[in-house]
Design a protein with these regions (language model features):
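Hydrophobic/aromatic-rich alpha-helical bundle segments in the mid-to-C-terminal region
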Residues: 116-120, 146-197, 206-207
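Helix-turn-helix
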Residues: 14, 18, 22-56, 60
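Amphipathic alpha-helical packing segments from all-alpha helical-bundle domains
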Residues: 100-110, 123-150, 161-168
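Amphipathic alpha-helical segments used for helix-helix packing
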Residues: 84-88, 102-125, 176
Length: 208
């Protein structure tokens, strides 16, 4: 009977699991492909069959979380853009913000290990600046929404620096939450209060 093939999906999954442990223990910089292969019981050749390099492997470890987060943000951003383009800038449905936040919180805690890898163990990898890239993505969207609302309320456009700071505040809220709160239900309560705070600040700037 032929021996088990090393180039199968089970081997890939096992490598990802072992890599996750190695990255959690040592961070991206300290982790070694040799150590990961030893834990997985495979050769480095088997690892390179699935992954180009250590960065590719790290991205694979955190990939599911990042894909889900991007999809939630894409759906929420699309909803808000449709609101603005349909002349409902003054009628924004705040409940959509709370729904999106609940989805984000659930994903952050479903993949909390992976989230913490990106936030605290990613130095030296292509994921190192992911929080900054999320701020940039949020910033572009917020600038569009803010301009539409300011026009609807006939008030001057909020300064770009302020919009950028608000974008940082939104991302920083989640970073603080996931790095300081262990329980998902407690995190959701925190996030809901955070959204109330952020919405109050937003409307305080654009409503006359």
């Amino acid at each position: 009977m032929a021996g088990k093939k090393i180039h199968d999906s089970e081997t890939k999954i096992h490598l990802i699991q072992c890599a996750k442990k190695e990255f959690m223990e040592k961070g991206f910089v300290g982790a070694s492909l040799r150590g990961i292969c030893q834990k997985a019981g495979v050769t480095t050749g088997a690892l390179y069959f699935f992954f180009q390099d250590k960065d590719d492997l790290f991205c694979e470890v955190v990939g599911n979380f990042m894909d889900r987060l991007k999809e939630i943000l894409r759906e929420h951003f699309s909803f808000e853009v449709r609101e603005m383009e349909s002349g409902k800038a003054k009628e924004h449905d705040d409940s959509s913000d709370f729904e999106a936040v609940a989805q984000v919180v659930h994903e952050l805690y479903t993949y909390r290990d992976e989230v913490l890898l990106v936030l605290t163990k990613a130095q030296g990898s292509s994921m190192e600046r992911m929080p900054d890239r999320l701020v940039d993505q949020m910033d572009e969207h917020n600038a569009f929404i803010c301009e539409a609302m300011c026009k609807a309320y006939h008030v001057p456009m909020v300064e770009q620096s302020v919009v950028h700071w608000m974008s940082h505040s939104q991302i920083d809220m989640f970073i603080f939450m996931v790095t300081h709160i262990d329980d998902e239900e407690e995190a959701l309560r925190f996030a809901e209060k955070g959204v109330k705070y952020l919405l109050a600040g937003w409307y305080g700037l654009i409503r006359p």
